[in-house]
From Swiss-Prot:
Organism: Vibrio vulnificus (strain YJ016)
Name this polypeptide is given: PF03932 family protein CutC
Subcellular location: Cytoplasm
Similarity annotation: Belongs to the CutC family.
UniProt xrefs under InterPro entries: CutC-like, CutC-like_dom_sf
GO molecular function annotation: copper ion binding
Chief localization: cytoplasm
Keyword entries, A-Z: Cytoplasm
GO CC annotations on file: cytoplasm
Length: 250
């Protein structure tokens, strides 16, 4: 298949579902509801053992923006080491300055660290919060990233098709532009054909009910409107249908 389908997951059940659906790469996270945070070392280790395709770990120490303190930067470096020690193939991160530019100095340190550990690097959707996407694109290329995950600076990739098309043209195959946010079996073929992207990113999110037979109703583990007995998972058929839609245009 000439297209890559990366599936972002935040639990081991979703790993099995993504692989069964035909994912060609995994982005390993925790807390997808928060945009994806760094997965645990245990999760990284087991995913490395089970996966039949490359696994890249999200390296994001907290929710929120991508302007990191010195302590957070130290955490990021340690988590990159952990990803390599767990046996993963790559890492995913993004760092910005306060005024919306790529934090070139710190990003260079992280990329050099990752490359010294034989890890690939994806620059994530922090890119979509840059003030000058084309300057940022050139900086990320110069820094040596393999790809950029982006919605085309829009709320979703289908809404960002014009920018995605421009980014693909400007990149001139010096790195991959991977479209993500709102990608589905319904829109993926049009998205790929219209923009020229060869890599697509989605979660294929669904839910399943808890297998608990006793449901405690008086306590909450998270937000008041969050159902603790609904488990978010990747939907196998969504991934499979996305892969099939792309095969139909390959």
């Amino acid at each position: 298949m000439s297209y890559q389908v990366e599936v972002c997951i935040d639990n081991i059940e979703s790993l099995h579902n993504a692989l069964e659906g035909g994912a060609t790469r995994i982005e390993l996270c925790s807390s997808l509801a928060l945009g994806g945070l760094t997965p645990s070392y245990g999760f990284m280790t087991l995913a490395a053992k089970l996966s039949t395709v490359p696994v890249y770990a999200m390296i994001r120490p907290r929710q929120g923006d991508f302007l990191y303190s010195d302590d957070e930067f130290a955490i990021i470096q340690q988590d990159i080491l952990s990803a390599q020690q767990a046996g993963l193939q790559g890492v995913v991160f993004g760092l910005l300055t306060a005024d919306g530019d790529i934090d070139v100095a710190r990003t260079r340190v992280l990329i050099e660290l990752a490359h010294s550990l034989q890890l690939g690097v994806t620059f994530h959707r922090a890119f979509d919060q840059c003030r000058d996407p084309f300057a940022a694109l050139e900086q990320i290329i110069d820094l040596g990233c393999e790809r950029i995950l982006t919605s085309g600076l829009a709320a979703s990739a289908p809404l960002g098709k014009e920018m995605l098309t421009q980014l693909v043209a400007h990149s001139q195959s010096r790195l991959a532009i991977m479209a993500g946010a709102g990608v589905s079996p319904v829109n993926v073929a049009d998205l790929a054909l219209t923009t020229g992207v060869k890599e697509l990113h989605l979660s294929g999110k669904s839910t399943r009910p808890s297998k608990m037979t006793f449901i405690a109703s008086g306590s909450k583990m998270g937000a008041a409107d969050q159902d603790d007995f609904i488990i978010p998972i990747t939907h196998t058929a969504t991934i499979r249908n996305t892969v099939l839609a792309l095969k139909s245009i390959s």
